[in-house]
Amino acid sequence: MKSAWALALACTLLLAASVTAEEVDVDATVEEDLGKSREGSRTDDEVVQREEEAIQLDGLNASQIKEIREKSEKFAFQAEVNRMMKLIINSLYKNKEIFLRELISNASDALDKIRLISLTDENALAGNEELTVKIKCDKEKNMLHVTDTGIGMTKEELIKNLGTIAKSGTSEFLNKMTEMQDDSQSTSELIGQFGVGFYSAFLVADRVIVTSKHNNDTQHIWESDSNEFSVIDDPRGNTLGRGTTITLVLKEEASDYLELDTVKNLVKKYSQFINFPIYVWSSKTETVEEPVEEEEAKEEKEETDDNEAAVEEEEEEKKPKTKKVEKTVWDWELMNDIKPIWQRPSKEVEEDEYKAFYKTFSKEHDDPMAYIHFTAEGEVTFKSILFVPNSAPRGLFDEYGSKKSDFIKLYVRRVFITDDFHDMMPKYLNFVKGVVDSDDLPLNVSRETLQQHKLLKVIRKKLVRKTLDMIKKIAEEKYNDTFWKEFGTNVKLGVIEDHSNRTRLAKLLRFQSSHHESNLTSLDQYVERMKEKQDKIYFMAGASRKEAESSPFVERLLKKGYEVIYLTEPVDEYCIQALPEFDGKRFQNVAKEGVKFEESEKSKESREALEKEFEPLLNWMKDKALKDKIEKAVLSQRLTQSPCALVASQYGWSGNMERIMKAQAYQTGKDISTNYYASQKKTFEINPRHPLIKDMLRRVKENEDDKTVSDLAVVLFETATLRSGYMLPDTKEYGDRIERMLRLSLNIDLDAKVEEEPEEPEDAAEEAEQDEEEVDADAEDSETQKESTDVKDEL
């Protein structure tokens, strides 16, 4: 019974399906242009409008081009233009890709003009209310189109602006608008030279076609192959509404500029911060719903289980049969969606916006350590945002000073000009990243020599001041733990190189000191902790903190409670030498002459008595024992535990500096032994309270010709040389002298020879060697025989 009922139901459904099929056009297909729509729900009018938009960007058809060339009015380029184009094509622009930057820049200028006119003329935008730049690649026709809805050009302007170089469309416009401007309105946005940058199109194009529509004229076409140009009324009439389309018929080797990715990357690289939206005609794959074909529906129904067929067919009747299909969709894609936040007041920009902009602009993943957003006014006006990265860029000091800095991008009226500067920022600030946008710099073909412009020096000066202000505001804990670790060397180099900002930079310096085992100290903090009558800032340089704090030069200073700054980096001593004073306090290298302490009258008398007592020893050292090695010998005020030290003059090299200079000389292959500073003799300071020195005084008084005492004096000198950070010129002689002193201390005769190893006759040596081999062989045979016996026993 149930089977009969199911069979009847199936027949009924099949009959209904056949009736439905008769009502549907079997030959109907999905509309070919459905994929042109971004959304399946878009209306036909929207699709048509967008397609017409694309067609307007296309090049002229063959018949129209033929008509243009037959009826067009021919013109010769001005002589200066011919020379300029040859200069551009052959040498001026080393990088061809900038042609797109120039064309977009010109489009932006044209949009600026019409926007300004529209403020006083409500009908100015009647032809086209959009203010945009649109770019379309046509691979089939080998054409690239750049369209703007700017002010456009009349026939006369096309001839004048694109055929001559003496008159610039933008500068003429600026002169005309001067009378119309209110005193409170800036005309700097209109500065530029349209006609010059335009010729860069011939870097990549064999032929350039300019279609332009001005509100006060009909639409015209300008065409050139760089030898001559022609102008004619556009036979298509007004297709633009208002604005200009530049069509480039690309050279064979420039076909890469028809690739969407290439064009998009160039727009983002050079023009992402233009004031007006820039669109590129782009494709992407989207999934759309399409009706299911009748044959597919039948196949699905046949595969359906008999027991569920009724239920499924009933559900399908309630909704249309569709399937998901991937389609290529073409539409305008916005390229410059990142707003130029430096154009907004800093109070209106959130911290998260700065961080997001930094990551996009610098291609970094981390947030910046610090940033500053400011507007500079005066001789030159510009807006800027500067950032300190969270970590030092890789290879920060590779080829320091010889490589360009890539981290400051210069814009002129939101148009990227270059980041290839050698002196936009000083070398020591080569880690700072940011943008500079000025309205006062020229935006024309001469930008390749822009870094010679006098206004850049003014910009540089202000950038440095603002950067130092930004660094100064970094919190103390973050500064010491992070900034100084990453960029401390840069600040020290700044003290050496930047005379005008040396005082500001000195306040940013941080060093280790005897005040704390691990914390860094600033010079301000050091001065605050100075003793009441202390008039100098004491420092000691060494290869490490341990070396510096164990130096004999700091003994008395530390004992008396003076704080000593430890310089442990190679650049540190250079840095301090470049800094004559800080807060009225001069620096004193404790490894050099000049360390003196306040002393009472009693202390002074005691010192003078000691000097008189040790005068024989001091004179003997200077005139006899160390005659060719030292400048003079004196009693030391800085030693407490060490017997002696070797002290450089105020203008000589300390031990640390000499080591650095020699290391540099080895790298460069130079010989510094004849250098004035290296060849200077040093002062030999002795500690009159040390037992070695006291005993030497006694021996010299007894017999100043004693060879042992002379050796002792030289050993003390050489030991002091090493402990003072210097290198010995002859280490073998030093070793021999130490050996003699050890012999004396152990009562070993100085002439005692080293016992020689007895030599065996060659024949005896060979016999002994043969005997050893025979013994080894006998032992091996014995061992083998024993192993064989053991095996037999086991068996």
UniProtKB/Swiss-Prot annotation:
PANTHER family reported in the protein's UniProt record: HEAT SHOCK PROTEIN 90 FAMILY MEMBER
Annotated coiled-coil segments of the chain: none
GO cellular component, one term: endoplasmic reticulum
Pfam family, one: HSP90
Protein name: Endoplasmin
InterPro entries: HATPase_C_sf, Heat_shock_protein_90_CS, HSP90_C, Hsp90_fam, Hsp90_N, Ribosomal_Su5_D2-typ_SF
Cleaved signal peptide residues: 1-21
The reaction(s) this protein catalyses: ATP + H2O = ADP + phosphate + H(+)
Motif (Prevents secretion from ER): 792-795
NCBIfam families xref list: PRK05218.1
GO biological process, one term: ERAD pathway
Keywords from the UniProt entry: ATP-binding, Calcium, Chaperone, Disulfide bond, Endoplasmic reticulum, Glycoprotein, Hydrolase, Nucleotide-binding, Sarcoplasmic reticulum, Signal, Stress response
Major location category of this protein: endoplasmic reticulum
GO MF, one annotated term: unfolded protein binding
Ligand binding (ATP): 106, 148, 161, 198
Family listed: Belongs to the heat shock protein 90 family.
Glycosylation (residues): 61, 106, 216, 444, 480, 501
Site (Important for ATP hydrolysis): 447
Biased composition (Acidic residues): 289-316, 756-782
Oligomer status and interactors: Homodimer; disulfide-linked.
Basic and acidic residues bias spans: 783-795
SMART domains documented for this protein: HATPase_c
